Amino acid sequence: MTSIVRTLRSLTLWELVSGMALTFRYMLKPKVTINYPFEKGYLSPRFRGEHALRRYANGEERCIACKLCEAICPAQAITIEAEPRTDGSRRTTRYDIDMTKCIYCGFCEEACPVDAIVEGPNFEFAAETREELLYNKAKLLANGDRWEPELALRLRKDAAYR
């Protein structure tokens, strides 16, 4: 009995008919395609994109050179050098992130006691050379200045879960 059914299905091209029915069913539904450069998709509030160093409202950088982010980075993408200041506190003289090594795990952001290093909302940072993906302190501070309103809002919303 099953061989007869199998033969009838192969003669009537049942697979082709069922495939075409599925195609026509989806053809009549609304489109879900996003026209990317002109339309942007939804980003999660916890999206981890390009890194940034934040500043306090008075313009002073937040990083206290504790080097916790450097120690916790599983990819060893962060390099920090620090010097003591005249008031006894420490500040970074060099803060580099090799974005070619970074795995965007967010451990650096979690380890930072003063929310100095954060991962911002930008995911469009393609480069033509490897050197463009070696971020220094100036580049990271510029990123932080550019996205500070978005970063502060995101951190306030996420504060209950930290």
Swiss-Prot record:
Its EC number is 7.1.1.-. One of its GO terms (molecular function) is NADH:ubiquinone reductase (non-electrogenic) activity. Its main location: membrane. InterPro entries: 4Fe4S_Fe-S-bd, 4Fe4S_Fe_S_CS, NADH_quinone_OxRdtase_chainI. Its cofactor is [4Fe-4S] cluster. It is a peripheral membrane protein. [4Fe-4S] cluster 2 binds at residues 73, 102, 105, 108. The keyword Iron applies. It is found in: Cell inner membrane. Pfam families: Fer4_7. GO terms for biological process: aerobic respiration. Disulfide bonds: none annotated. PROSITE patterns: 4FE4S_FER_1 (PS00198), 4FE4S_FER_2 (PS51379). Belongs to the complex I 23 kDa subunit family. NDH-1 is composed of 14 different subunits. Subunits NuoA, H, J, K, L, M, N constitute the membrane sector of the complex. This is NADH-quinone oxidoreductase subunit I.
